[in-house]
Amino acid sequence: MVATNRCCVFALLFALLLVHSLTEAGKGKEVLGKIKDKLIEAKDKIKSGWERLTSQSEYACPAIEKFCEDHCAAKKAVGKCDDFKCNCIKL
């Protein structure tokens, strides 16, 4: 009789632990989902800020001028950045 009651108590505790674990796992997914959404939102803000910055030619050229210089140097020319277009001028 006592052994049966202990079994029931342990089974009840196990069931409560299982329910608690499943509940916490659901909350964990919810928290991870919120973190993922915030990271996506931050990425979109950074990307739109960069696009806005580079859409203005006076700011874009310094950002890509080094790429243009390197690209044209490989062709044995001088690179000149002009409104997002890399112009290679041969010497």
Swiss-Prot record:
Q: List the signal peptide residues.
A: 1-25
Could you tell me which InterPro entries the record lists for this protein? Long_scorpion_toxin_alpha/beta (IPR029237)
Q: Give the BetaSPN-type CS-alpha/beta domain ranges.
A: 58-91
Keyword ATP-binding set for record:
no
Gene Ontology biological process: defense response to bacterium
Tissue and organ distribution: Expressed by the venom gland.
Gene Ontology molecular function: any one = toxin activity
* Cellular component annotations (GO), alphabetically ordered: extracellular region
**What positions belong to the pro-peptide in this record?**
26-44
Q: Does the keyword Disulfide bond apply?
A: yes
Cell location: Secreted
Bridged cysteine pairs (disulfide)? 61-81, 68-86, 72-88
| First-listed, main subcellular location of the protein, grouped into a coarse class | secreted
Q: What is the stated purpose of this protein?
A: The full peptide presents antibacterial and cytotoxic activities. The synthetic C-terminus (AA 33-76) inhibits voltage-gated potassium channels Kv1.1/KCNA1, Kv1.2/KCNA2, and Kv1.3/KCNA3.
Task: Say which family it is in.
Answer: Belongs to the long chain scorpion toxin family. Class 2 subfamily.
Could you identify this protein by its name? Potassium channel toxin TtrKIK
Lineage at the top is: Eukaryota, Metazoa, Ecdysozoa, Arthropoda, Chelicerata
